């Protein structure tokens, strides 16, 4: 009797080879164990220039492109346009694109001296959002500051890790949820980042100083470096708090003496009240994502950097990515994000999303 086993085995091999070819045409290898896929305008993204992204509480990915906010649910994109004329002015913010999600299910899109607000539940842009602040019965304090002798306008806005909205008005920092008001001293410089651990409020200034408050009282200040070195890193700041309460920060600026860009990656430990330097370079670091106290991802002009602090502070540099069409991407990675499932997302200037 004729055996069909050899033919079945051959068919299985052909079948597996076929599907292997199909899958590898979409998944490309980045490093030893890294594979990625590409999402761009062909998959419904409004445009291929990614300015910033973050994962929302419901699992969706919010992606800022020049045309607006693209919300990705794992299957398709939906676009919420952000017309320039609908932006509100925040004169003290001079950084890059930053996304915040607050406790009222609003997404704040902060850019150089302007801000947008999206009502996520309704999927629409909220007009004049600063006029609606604050909520929870705190209008009197806000009105007093706006209508008082100084007639302070809202000049900047932050959302902390507890999803509270804070606004800067003159030399005051106001929590719009509970009315806590903090005085910022002029000699500290300009506020660039803010966060809280539930007990203390941390105000990160462009001078490298962090001012720490309990309620509205100053607890202490400390600095990341000397006043002379601070001149190199005044331009931008991005601070991330880990679940254990540690702070990691990238700062950028310009080294005028050497005529180069300047960036530094820092760790601030609230328990010791001290800063430590992790990494410095003569090019611009873009975005920072921390998956734990032991691992960090930073996007930069040359690709992205992967830090594993268990192995030291020297990063693994990923400078070249092989795209599905056979081309290589060597520059143009603007932002990096690790989602709740551990997947790494890369936002590029010209090639959409890579994950």
What are these regions (language model features)?
Residues 1-355:
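Carboxylate-rich, polar loop motifs that coordinate divalent cations or form catalytic acidic clusters
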């Amino acid at each position: 009797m004729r055996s069909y086993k050899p033919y079945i085995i051959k068919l299985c091999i052909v079948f597996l080879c076929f599907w292997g070819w199909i899958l590898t045409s979409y998944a490309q290898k980045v490093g030893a164990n890294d594979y990625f896929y590409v999402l761009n305008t062909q998959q419904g993204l409004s445009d291929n220039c990614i300015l910033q992204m973050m994962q929302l509480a419901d699992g969706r990915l919010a992606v800022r492109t020049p045309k607006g906010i693209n919300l990705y649910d794992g299957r398709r994109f939906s676009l919420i346009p952000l017309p320039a004329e609908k932006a509100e002015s925040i004169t003290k913010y001079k950084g890059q694109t930053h996304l915040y999600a607050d406790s009222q299910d609003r997404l704040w899109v902060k850019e150089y001296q302007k801000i947008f607000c999206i009502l996520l539940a309704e999927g629409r842009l909220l007009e004049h959002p600063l006029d609606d602040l604050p909520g929870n019965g705190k209008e009197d304090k806000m009105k007093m500051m706006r209508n008082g002798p100084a007639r302070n306008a809202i000049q900047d806005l932050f959302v902390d890790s507890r999803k509270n909205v804070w606004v800067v008005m003159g030399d005051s920092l106001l929590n719009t949820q509970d009315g806590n008001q903090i005085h910022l001293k002029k000699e500290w410089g300009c506020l660039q980042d803010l966060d809280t651990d539930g007990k203390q409020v941390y105000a990160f200034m462009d001078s490298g100083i962090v001012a720490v408050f309990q309620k509205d009282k100053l607890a202490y200040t400390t600095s990341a470096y000397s006043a002379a070195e601070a001149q190199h890193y005044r331009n931008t700041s991005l601070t991330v708090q880990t679940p254990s309460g540690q702070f990691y920060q990238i700062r950028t600026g310009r080294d005028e003496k050497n005529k180069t860009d300047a960036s530094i990656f820092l760790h601030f430990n609230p328990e010791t009240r001290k800063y430590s330097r992790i990494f410095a370079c003569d090019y611009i670091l873009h975005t920072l994502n921390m998956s734990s106290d032991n691992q960090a991802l930073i996007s930069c002009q040359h690709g992205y950097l992967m830090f594993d602090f268990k192995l030291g502070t020297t990063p693994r540099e990923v400078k070249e990515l092989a795209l599905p069409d056979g081309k290589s991407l060597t520059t143009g990675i603007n932002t990096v994000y690790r989602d709740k499932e551990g997947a790494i997302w890369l936002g590029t200037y010209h090639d959409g999303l890579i994950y």
